[in-house]
């Protein structure tokens, strides 16, 4: 699979989750932050990243940089996906179903963020198992990466391109 160059794209980023950690030292607590970020161009390209730093803006910046290195292409069909798919990561499962035009994004939290930046406009989703944002984002990306366009499926099956 070809690597997608982020410099050629107009990417938007969305912060999914910010976590504050505390290291207890002799003088008190030292706080650090981690940010889970998704980026996408709104036309079928999406990626996620996890940045950690002492300050929130720096953690977000690091997350965006990492997300730009993990981009995947999603085959869209009329602002939806071509078929039902289940993505898995850890204990998290995400079910994605295509929806008719005008339905909108029926998804919660982390799944909604990933789908909106990727450019999916009409879709139904359900989180099964873990609701941890990290697991849900990775499971959603896994589900989207399992999708194939009609042309790719025909080529895999060796069928002629006639419908």
Curated annotation (Swiss-Prot):
An MF annotation (GO) of this entry: rRNA binding
SUPFAM superfamilies: dsRNA-binding domain-like, Ribosomal protein S5 domain 2-like
Domain S5 DRBM: 11-74
One Pfam family this sequence matches: Ribosomal_S5_C
InterPro entries reported in the protein's UniProt record: Ribosomal_Su5_D2-typ_SF (IPR020568), Ribosomal_uS5 (IPR000851), Ribosomal_uS5_bac-type (IPR005712), Ribosomal_uS5_C (IPR005324), Ribosomal_uS5_N (IPR013810), Ribosomal_uS5_N_CS (IPR018192), Ribsml_uS5_D2-typ_fold_subgr (IPR014721)
Known partners and oligomeric status: Part of the 30S ribosomal subunit. Contacts proteins S4 and S8.
Function field: With S4 and S12 plays an important role in translational accuracy.
UniProt protein name: Small ribosomal subunit protein uS5
Gene name of this polypeptide: rpsE
